[in-house]
Amino acid sequence: MFNRNYRTPLKLRHSNFGFRWQPMTPSRGRLRHNKPSASRKLSYDRVEREMRTNSIVEVQHGSHMSLEKNTDVSSFVQYPARGINGDGRCRDYIKLLKLDVSGVINIKSSNGDQDMEPGDKLSGLFILTVLLDKKPYLPEGVNKLPSFAELFGPYSAAYANMHLLDSQKPRFKVLGTIKKFVNCTPGTLYGPLKLNMPLSRRKCPLWTTFKDPDQGNCGGNYKNISKNAIVLSYAFISMHSLIVEPYFQFELKYVG
């Protein structure tokens, strides 16, 4: 408790005007404040910045994606990585805004044209399905995403309105579908395909979260996503010996 009767100790000091009693408390002007030394330690911590709107573009094509008749391939949309220099995303989560899909398919006969008559037709159905994987998961030692049959059942399901199997509905949601019916003479056919999908709305935003276990493992691949990955299902159905070579570009707009 403060004591009102307490007085600062005095000391008799000599000056040009004689002896005077002065308080023993040192003057503030005489105090010297030592500046802290600057840290010379190098820091490689992540640069934290404000979240901003950005986009990432990915192209999927190649021999590993070629489809023969009645086959399918599963893939995913790459998300931005989190870098120490501030590029890409700056948090372990992003807001998905929009996904633009564009590309072509190259269709050709797998057994050549020598067995085909000039008036013969080659027919088939190409399907690209974009799905939201709410809870991304791959068992230990498994690197293959769910196939068309595991998601929708037999290939014949593609001829009508496609619906997920009941066992997959809690985890997956269909965001959009591209269907291209092929009916061509022997040779090569290019079909331009486009799909634009808004992912977030004002009252219904869509967020994705990442595991980011350490600074060296903060990528945008499927295994590092803990919530809301985008899975792609390519499939081709035909009664003829055809090969489909897809070439698609995915442009993802996000806030992160």
From Swiss-Prot:
GO terms for molecular function: single-stranded DNA binding; structural molecule activity. It is a peripheral membrane protein. One of its GO terms (biological process) is DNA transport. A motif (Nuclear localization signal) lies at residues 81-96. A motif (Bipartite nuclear localization signal) lies at residues 18-39. Coiled coil: none annotated. InterPro entries: Gemini_BR1, GV_A/BR1_coat. Pfam families: Gemini_coat. One of its GO terms (cellular component) is host cell. Residues 150-187 are annotated as: Interaction with Arabidopsis thaliana NSI protein. Keywords: DNA-binding, Host cell membrane, Host cytoplasm, Host membrane, Host nucleus, Host-virus interaction, Membrane, Transport, Viral movement protein. Residues 23-44 are annotated as: Disordered. It is found in: Host nucleus; Host cytoplasm; Host cell membrane. Binds to the genomic viral ssDNA, shuttles it into and out of the cell nucleus. Begomoviruses use 2 proteins to transport their DNA from cell to cell. The nuclear shuttle protein (NSP) shuttles it between nucleus and cytoplasm and the movement protein (MP) probably transports the DNA-NSP complex to the cell periphery and facilitates movement across the cell wall. Belongs to the begomovirus nuclear shuttle protein family. Binds to single-stranded and double-stranded viral DNA. Interacts with the host nuclear shuttle interacting (NSI) protein. This interaction may allow NSP to recruit NSI monomers to the viral genome and thus regulate nuclear export of viral genome by NSP. This is Nuclear shuttle protein. The lineage of its organism: Viruses, Monodnaviria, Shotokuvirae, Cressdnaviricota, Repensiviricetes.
